[in-house]
Design a protein with these regions (language model features):
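Sterile Alpha Motif
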Residues: 1-18, 42-95
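Catalytic DNA-binding helix-loop module of base-excision-repair DNA glycosylases/AP lyases
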Residues: 21-30
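ATP/adenylate-binding site constellation spanning eukaryotic-like Ser/Thr protein kinases
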Residues: 31, 39-42
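Residue-level recognition of specific faces of alpha-helices
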Residues: 11-14, 25, 36
Length: 95
């Protein structure tokens, strides 16, 4: 069962939208505990994940990073696709 609040998230997999695969992606970025997501830039996490993978990954990964960071900073649990429009705007600015 997923955590209802940031305080209840003890493992990365407790965070809404985070399953084993994305938890592994976060661990590859040296994020091992949910609290480490507080204050992180999800767009930078996505950029670093792409560098590590050697290719641009599915942009939905960025949406998931946004959802996870926002949740751990006290925001509501939202599905990752809630952040798709925001990500498109933000990444569009950087091009």
């Amino acid at each position: 069962m997923k955590a209802a609040s940031a305080a209840a998230a003890l493992r990365l997999e407790d965070i809404p939208n985070i399953g084993p695969s994305i938890a592994d992606d976060l661990r590859a970025l040296d994020i091992f505990e949910p609290a480490q997501l507080r204050g992180q830039d999800p767009y930078e996490l996505y950029r670093l994940s792409n560098l590590r993978a050697g290719a641009e990954q599915d942009p939905c990964l960025c949406d998931t990073f946004i959802a996870a960071v926002r949740f751990m900073e006290g925001g509501p649990a939202r599905p990752w696709w809630y952040y798709t429009d925001e990500r498109k705007r933000e990444l569009g600015k950087k091009k």
